[in-house]
C-alpha cells in the first residue's frame, strides 16, 4: 500500500464507489494533492472538492500526470470513455471497478494490457469492504 500512496491516481468517474475508495486512500495517508477525479457532473465535483482533491470535467487532462487510472464510470458510458482515452495510457496502470466490464474488452478499447479488474463490494462505502482482484500476467505485484 505504501507504494500506492506515492503515486498520482486519477479516478474517471466520481460516484459512490470512487468516493469510498478515495476516502480509504486519504484515511491511509495518501496526500489529496495526488488524487484527481474527472466527472461530468458539477454537483459530484463540488462534493469531491470538499475532500481537497483535484477535480475536472476533462478526462484527458485528468490522466496527464497519473501513474494509476481508476475507471469508475457507469457501464453504459464505459465504451465512450475508453474510446476517448485510447492510446493515452502508455506506462500507466489501469484499474477498472466498472461492473460487467472484462479485461479483454477494456484492453482492446484502450490499446493497453496493464489492467487490473477490481470488484469492490458495498461495505467499501464504510471502509470495511473486501475486493476481488484479477490482473493479466504482465501486471507486476507492485
Task: Locate each region found by the language model.
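Conserved active-site and cofactor/substrate-binding residues in soluble primary-metabolism enzymes
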Residues: 12, 16, 73-76, 101, ...
